């Protein structure tokens, strides 16, 4: 995680966490955020045993719809990998019994919205959210949802 994305300013720009300064921050983040998640996946390349990103159910939105969040190492942006990963996770979450799934992105990161649209998600609203954990700064987000087919 640290080598591939948590220390990268380009990746952290649109995430709710600041770039990690050293591996101990990533270790803390992993222990306190990711490992407790009931639905959490690492993204890897076929035949490789190194994570290049992740997808998690990060909570519920204000109307009780579970939301996913995702991240990918910068060198893999724009190659269709996140769309493939999100499609697989949505399929698995629906298989597990979820009826509706949501996702949101910072309006300054329209590529993330394109991933959501390619995965069949529909725009539902704009909202405001904390830009970074531990900050009072807000950012505008676009929210999408998809219902079980």
Where in the sequence are the language-model features?
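Conserved GNAT-fold acetyl-CoA-binding loop/helix
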Residues: 10-31
């Amino acid at each position: 995680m640290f080598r591939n994305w948590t220390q990268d300013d380009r990746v952290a720009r649109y995430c709710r966490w600041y770039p990690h300064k050293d591996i101990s921050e990533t270790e803390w983040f992993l222990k306190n955020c990711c490992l407790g998640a009931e639905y959490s996946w690492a993204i890897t390349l076929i035949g490789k045993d190194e994570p290049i990103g992740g997808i998690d159910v990060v909570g519920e939105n204000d109307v009780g719809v579970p939301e996913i969040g995702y991240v990918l190492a910068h060198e893999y942006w724009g190659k269709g990998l996140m769309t493939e990963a999100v499609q697989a996770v949505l399929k698995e979450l629906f298989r597990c019994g979820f009826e509706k799934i949501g996702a949101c992105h910072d309006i300054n990161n329209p590529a993330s919205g394109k991933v959501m649209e390619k995965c069949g998600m529909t725009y539902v609203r704009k909202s405001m959210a904390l830009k970074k954990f531990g900050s009072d700064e807000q950012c505008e987000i676009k929210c999408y949802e998809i219902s079980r087919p």
